Structures are given as structure tokens and as C-alpha cells.
Amino acid sequence: MKFYALFIYRPVATILLSIAVTLCGVLGFRLLPVAPLPQVDFPVIMVSASLPGASPETMASSVATPLERSLGRIAGVNEMTSTSSLGSTRIILEFNFDRDINGAARDVQAAINAAQSLLPSGMPSRPTYRKANPSDAPIMILTLTSDTFSQGELYDYASTQLAQTIAQIDGVGDVDVGGSSLPAVRVALNPQALFNQGVSLDTVRSAISNANVRRPQGAIEDAQRRWQLQTNDELKTAAEYEPLIVHYNNGAAVHLRDVATVTDSVQDVRNAGMTNAKPAILLMIRKLPEANIIETVDRIRAALPELRDTIPAAIDMQIAQDRSPTIRASLAEVEQSLAISVGLVILVVFLFLRSGRATLIPAVAVPVSLIGTFAAMYLCGFSLNNLSLMALTIATGFVVDDAIVALENISRHLEAGVKPLQAALQGVREVGFTVLSMSLSLVAVFLPLLLMGGLPGRLFREFAVTLSVAIGISLVVSLTLTPMMCGWLLKAKPSEETRSRVGINRLLLALQGGYARSLGWVLNHARLVGLVLLATIALNVWLYISIPKTFFPEQDTGRLMGGIQADQSISFQAMRGKLQDFMKIIREDPAVDNVTGFTGGSRVNSGMMFISLKPLGERTESAQQVIDRLRKKLAREPGASLFLMAVQDIRVGGRQSNASYQYTLLSDDLAALREWEPKIRQALAKLPQLADVNSDQQDNGAEMSLVYDRESMARLGISVQDANSLLNNAFGQRQISTIYQPLNQYKVVMEVDPRYTQDISALDQMFVMNSEGKPIPLSWFAKWQPANAPLSVNHQGLSAASTIAFNLPTGVSLSEASDAITRTMTSLGVPSSVRGSFAGTAQVFQETMNSQVILILAAIATVYIVLGMLYESYVHPLTILSTLPSAGVGALLALEAFDAPFSLIALIGIMLLIGIVKKNAIMMVDFALEAQRSGQLSARDAIFQACLLRFRPIMMTTLAALFGALPLMIASGDGAELRQPLGITIVGGLVMSQLLTLYTTPVVYLFFDRLRLRFTRRAKPEDTLTASE
């Protein structure tokens, strides 16, 4: 009593305290960072190693395996996967959430150092690592184009100047440069000229290497001066290499230009990048796992003017893709929904109270509670994201409930003629415990969520804490500011009512009268209502089992990614043509804004594309509808497939795949894996629940297998090393020397001129100089025949692995796809040596599915414990919790009606309903218990009176919560797919709960009261017998 009076009788202090809370919230709002979702990125580190010319199997056994054994000992590694392709190995380490990325990086470097002695000696550089997830979509893509500069020169500017500077920006984890390679001097050899001049490839290589050296020359010094010695020992350009003497043939000098074409070109000619049909260099920027995407993008944009000044004016640098505009638009939509919710809630209050002064009270209480929450969010290190703003939108209906309960009860006393200050004090004292019970039991719902681990726990922690803080502030406001404003603003006698007020009042009285009559009938047919309650419990179970489920709603971020997979024996020239064809098809789609892509590198038969769609206001289709439309057109392209997927804000795992979801096959028997993977992939591709089924197992690449005749080699004076060196010199784009420049180092690359390697007959022209200096044709000691070889070798841990990726057709949920895969694997009879499991997002979905029911039950148990402690009763909490089945049925039926799968967002909606719908029961039970204790009423009369007295506040609070969630349910625009499931769940649950709990709660109350009396009667004879003894 003294607590309430302290604020009611000191209005100035109460007002100033509320203003202070609001100002702190405004300051917190201005300081809060902006993000699409809470920080849920797993710490990921990528280790890269190269050995030019080495086959995928050689890279896997000699490079990947030693590194994996060393890296596998690092603590906190969640998953380790590797991909070895021609000349390169990439290992992805995914760590637990609790691992600091910098500490993990130090452990990774130590593991690389430990494995160094086990790696091949011919590696041009030590393995390196990057703190970025290569499977994440870039947060920004920059393109460089020019009509005057070559692709190699553009790549040089991009990698030497731009990428280095951008990588130093805070928040940037990795900058990949694609579309070409660094400038180089290329020596294209003529095999016939070499044979005619009697010059071997090794001779040319040695001559070039010896002619271009960089060694210290020292200095000459006398008593007065010191001269630094400098020589022309380095050759920089193709023109300087052409006159180089590589051999003497019968005393005549053989120059390099006599046996080769020397050009200023690039290190690897098998790379291509394009943007909107124009050759381009791409800078793909990815953020650090812990970095804020909006802040990082803003820093990059701020640096772009300075970056443009560092490159020539003839180079055009453009932003081809930027993730931030759709994120900002989505957050603006949520903020708009929040404002609409506040307006609707206040409108509900006005319609019920029919007083401008009375409406002003919740109109002040709601903003104070919501704005004050921003201060707590800042102190907790949260961000303004879709989920935290959705929490505040939903909180609108909650925070007004507390004010409504207090305001309505005070208004009732005022209408009875009690003086304002006394009415405020008396009214808040009566409902203080009710408000406390409602708030604490609602916060209790989120305790299991706060303790939940893994990605779901991390994802919804900000949501739960934000909502809990808003409820906590609302609790304090409703017990302090609200009664103070009621005492000083409201009048003891209501003013003369207008015609509209009279009409609304008559409507409410009519509803209340109808409810009284129907409630009387229900109480006389309690068994029927009990059967209805049991039916809703059974219906909940059936609906939950049958409803389609997914991990997270499919987002439309306005960005698509595409992976090209062509025939495994395709040439680079043909692959570049496929890239151009695919880009032409996509550019013609009316929903597409721009498209960039690249191909080449270690895997010639693959490529990547990044597509920006037009803003939602300029297109009528969703991202998935655009993909469905393009899929039909892209399927007509022979010899290659392009798999498109919408970029999501959440992507789990470090695997780079050509679809959104993955199923991984593991085996210690590589032969068994290669035998069963095609069978499994073909079976899954036939399933109607899956789309775009593809695999990273590529073991059917074209290979020319050379078999050496070692006896002939010994007789001819040739070693295996000589023969292998010949092949590497001729066909491996061998880097034979280094050109040192002030800003970078460039290579001299040697290979046989591509004009002479158009078919396998090029091998007939190859020869080796034997120990006597005679040219020996390769065909004299080797035979060759076509064969198949893997283009890549994949590991997970230390086991051979193959990942089958898939997308979902429109209208199919992840649970339906997962069930279909599980059934197919069982029917195929896959041997135990080949193990299958979901990976990435699909794996987290499976884990979440197993914990959903436990989480809901834990929330119910927590609420029961809190209510039991508050009421000092085992029974009354059960009465209150009897409201939940009807809400669950309403929520699940609403999801079915809107064809929305049950996702994590819908799960949060169910948990919110646990907190919302029990408020009705709390208000009924509180007044019934008070009436029984003070009015000497029977249980039936007490609950009947409580239901009628609390009918208006119950209707007000329910409608306030419903209208608070309504903007989410009918949301459109950017990010609507995230908001809609939450709104649908809450609105559906509230409607069904309101229809049923007004009748089931009093029936359950009377049922438990009869049980209490029965046990009391049984206990009395026992007590009497004990006393007589």
C-alpha cells in the first residue's frame, strides 16, 4: 500500500522518473547498431594450400590429410571439411559458438606450423588461412571494367591496391578477386621448333630461370665514398625475354623468340569474369563472423571515393551487389508495423473506455515501456534487427495489458463514486498481484529459451530478453505511472456521455448479457465442455504431428546465387560460353536488375553467378517465383546446369554447394562411396519433394593415362623425373621465375603454345633430352589411353565424403523433404560402410525438431512453477494453464489455413501464446478467489461473478494483443515472410482461445474446486480418528 501511495501522491517525481527512462531509451536507440538478425554466425576459418599441377588425389593425400590430422586436434571444432582439386586444397573449420575467432585463428596457425614438415617440398608457399565463411554470400560485390585496360591489368589493380585496402576495413573478413589472374610473362613454346633446334623444355626453363635472378651485389667503398652495386640481372617484360639465348645449335645462338612466343599476359588464362555481358573483374567481399553487416557495408561505402582516386580514370568501378538496402527496407517495414500496432492498441483502449483522458494513460504508458527497452538492449549489446523489433511489436499488446487491468479497475471504482486518488490507490492495490502474476508468468515462458543452446538459442535470445525487459518496465509503469495518472487525470463522476459512447456501452452490455446467459448454460453442461477441452488437447497433438515444418521462413532478400555445373570433361573455352549463355537468359528476365559471374581456376567445369533482383516495389514475383520461372528456361541449355537459390540471412555450415540444403555421405571406403553416391543421387533426384539435386562428387573427368615403360627408359637414359618434368613444363602452366615489382611479385609462366595442344596428338610431339643429350620422343617410352579421374576429392573429418545438395520446390516444406530422403535411404539398402546424415541448415533443423516439444513442455512447466509459487497452490496453476490447448489449436489451424509451415518463428508464436492466453484465466481466478474469501460466495457464484466483472478487461486485453499482432500477420514488403508466421500464430491462437477459454476456464475452476472439497472431506475423518487415539 505504501509503495503505491509513494508514486500516486508524488506526481512530479513519478513523471520525472518516467521522462528519465524515456530519455535513456532514446539515447540507446540512437546508439544501437542495425542488423538483419541477431549475431548467429558460427566462427569459420578457411585454410588454403596450393601445389600447381598436382592432381586432386595427390592434393588430398599429400596436402589435405596431413593438415587435417593437425587441425583436427584443435579444441572446439564443430566440423572440418575439405575439398581438393587440381593444384589446390581448401579446408573449412567450423567452430562452436563459444570459440573466439581470434583465439581459434592462433590455434589454426599453430596447427599449420606443426604440419609443415609433412607437406610436399615443392609447394610454392605455406598454407594460409582466412577468417571468413566461403559459403556465405558476399555482403558486397564490386566490379572493374575498362575499354583500355586488359583483364590482367584490372586484376592487378583489384588485388594489389583495392583488395588490400578493403581487407583492412574493420569487419571485412575476406576479399576474393575473380575474373582473371595477375599479370605475367607467358612463354608459349613451339614443340616442332624446339625439336628442330635440339632444345629441351628443361633447357628453356633453366635458361629463363638463370637469366632472371635477384641477388644482392654488395657495395664498393673507399676512404671517402661508398657505391652500391646494381646490375640488370632482372628481366621485367616480354620484350626483354625474347632475345634471351637459351641454347647453341652447332655454334649458332638459339634465341627464345626462335622457339616460343613471348607475351605480356596473365598467370592463368583459364579465368573469366563478367557483369551484364561485359568482361569484368569481381571483388567479392565477405564479413568476419562476428561483424555487423550494415556497419561493415557503410565503412566500405565510405572508403569507395578514396579507392576510386587510387585507380586510373579509365577504370570504371561499380557496386554490382549490396546486401544492405533490403536489410534497411525490411527494418523500416518492421518499424512501421510497430507504429501501426501502437496506434491500433490505443484505438482499442479508446473504443472500450470512451474517454480521451482515460485513453491518454495507456497512450503514455506504452511508449515509455517500449522506448525504455532500447536502453536495456544497448546495455546488453543487442542490435536493432527484425527479431528484436518484432519483439517490441508483439510487446505492444502485452505492455498495454498491464495498464488496461489497472486502469479498468480504477475506472470501475470511479464510476462507483470513489474519489480519484482513493480510487487509484484502492484499484491498483486490488489488481497489483494480478498484474504481477501476469507479468512474471509471461517472462517465465522465455526462461527455457534463454537457457537453450545452439543456433536457435542464440538466434532468439535477443527476442526473449527484449520482450522480457519490455514486460518488466511495463509492470513497473502499470503500478506507478498508470495509477498516478488515473488519480490526477480521471474524474470521480463521468461526464455526460455522447451518443457514440452510449452506443458502444450498449454493445458491451449486450455482449456481456449474452455471455452471462451462455456461461450459465455451459456451467450446467460442464461434462460437454470437459470433452471439448480433451478434444482440443488431442487435436493439438495431431496437428503438430501432421503440419509441415521448416527451419526458418524462406526469405526474399532480393539476391540470388547460382552455381554452374557442366560436363566434367568440358574445356575452359566451352565453359566460358556456357557462362555467357546463362547470363543472357537471366538478364532477359524482367525481375532481374543485374547479374555478375565468373568461371575458371582449379575447377574448370564450374562457375558462380550473383544476381540482384529489382526492389519488391518494381516486381510482382517473389525470389522463389523468379527461380521457378528461370529454372524452366535454364534447363534448355545442353551440357551444363545452373542451380539458383535465394540468398538467406542465415546459412549454416562452411560447405560451398549449389543448393540451399545438404545431405552428406561419409565412408572410410572410397570405392564404396563412389559406387553408392550416384545411386543415391539418382534416387533422390526422382523425388517430387526435392529440386535441383546435385552432388560435389566429380569422379568422371576426362584423363589421359600415361604408362611408362621403365625398361625402355633405363635403356634410353631417361628418368621418371625427366618425363614428369617434361609434362609439367609443357602442360602445367609452370611458374618458372619471379618478377619483382615495387607493389607486387609477378610470374614467368611456361607451357606449350595452346595452338599445338588442341588434341591428344600433342603428346606425339613431346620429347626428352636423355643423358647423352639426344632428343627422345615421349612415344618411345610411354603409352597413353583415355581414362576417368576425379576433378575433386572431398573429406569430412578424416573420412571420404560426398555432399548431395538440394532445393525445395514451391509448396514443399523441409520436413517433407527430410522424411522423403530418410525413406529413400532406407529403401535403397545402403550398406553400413556408407553413412548418410543431414548437414548445414538441414542438420540444425533436425536437431531443432527434436527439441521443440521439450522446449514447449519446459515453458509450460516453468509457468506452472511460477504460478504455483505465486498462488501457493498446486491446483490453481492447472486451471490457468487449461487455456493453452485452445490457443495451440487456433495457432496450428491458422498456419494450415495460410499454408505456412511450422518454423522457428511459429514456435516463438506458440510460446508467446502460452504467456498471453493465460492472462484471461489469471484475471478470472484472482477475482473468484478474492470473492470466495471476502464475500462468502460459493465457488460457482464466485467464478460466475468473476467472469462477468472481468469480461470487459478480458476483451480489451485480448483485442489489444490481437491488434498488436495484426500488422505482422498482414505484413507485406521487405522481410514480410519473417513477420507473417508470428502474426498468424498469435492471431489464430488468440481468436480460438477467446472463443473457448471464457467457458472452459470456469468449468475447470469448478472441477478442481470439487476435487479439493472431496479430498478435504476424506481428510477430516482421518484427522478425527487420530485425535481420538
Curated annotation (Swiss-Prot):
Keywords: Cell inner membrane, Cell membrane, Membrane, Transmembrane, Transmembrane helix, Transport. It is found in: Cell inner membrane. It holds the Pfam family ACR_tran. GO terms for cellular component: plasma membrane. InterPro entries: AcrB_DN_DC_subdom (IPR027463), Acrflvin-R (IPR001036), Multidrug-R_MdtC (IPR023931). The chain crosses the membrane at residues 15-35, 333-353, 360-380, 387-407, 431-451, 469-489, 528-548, 853-873, 897-917, 953-973, 984-1004. The keyword S-adenosyl-L-methionine does not apply. It comes from Cronobacter sakazakii (strain ATCC BAA-894). Part of a tripartite efflux system composed of MdtA, MdtB and MdtC. MdtC forms a heteromultimer with MdtB. This is Multidrug resistance protein MdtC. One of its GO terms (molecular function) is xenobiotic transmembrane transporter activity. Belongs to the resistance-nodulation-cell division (RND) (TC 2.A.6) family. MdtC subfamily. It is a multi-pass membrane protein. Its main location: membrane.
